[in-house]
């Protein structure tokens, strides 16, 4: 039962990360000033 809980946690975290990167990409495409620094870093990370 504990193993299942860990798997669920990992899946949820992975899903959140995917959503976060998608959101970042959208923000970068719209060239939002606040995200410009994050976008520069984001380009170096191979998502």
From Swiss-Prot:
Disulfide bonds: none annotated. GO terms for cellular component: plasma membrane. GO terms for biological process: negative regulation of phosphorelay signal transduction system. The keyword Membrane applies. Pfam families: MgrB. The keyword Transmembrane helix applies. It is a single-pass membrane protein. It is found in: Cell inner membrane. The chain crosses the membrane at residues 6-26. Keywords: Cell inner membrane, Cell membrane, Membrane, Transmembrane, Transmembrane helix. Belongs to the MgrB family. May form homooligomers. Probably interacts with the periplasmic domain of PhoQ. PhoP-regulated transcription is redox-sensitive, being activated when the periplasm becomes more reducing. MgrB acts between DsbA/DsbB and PhoP/PhoQ in this pathway. Represses PhoP/PhoQ signaling, possibly by binding to the periplasmic domain of PhoQ, altering its activity and that of downstream effector PhoP. This is PhoP/PhoQ regulator MgrB. The gene is mgrB.
């Amino acid at each position: 039962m504990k193993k299942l809980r860990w798997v669920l946690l990992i899946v949820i975290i992975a899903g959140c990360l995917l959503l976060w990167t998608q959101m970042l990409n959208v923000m970068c495409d719209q060239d939002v000033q606040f995200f410009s620094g994050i976008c520069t870093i984001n380009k170096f990370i191979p998502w």
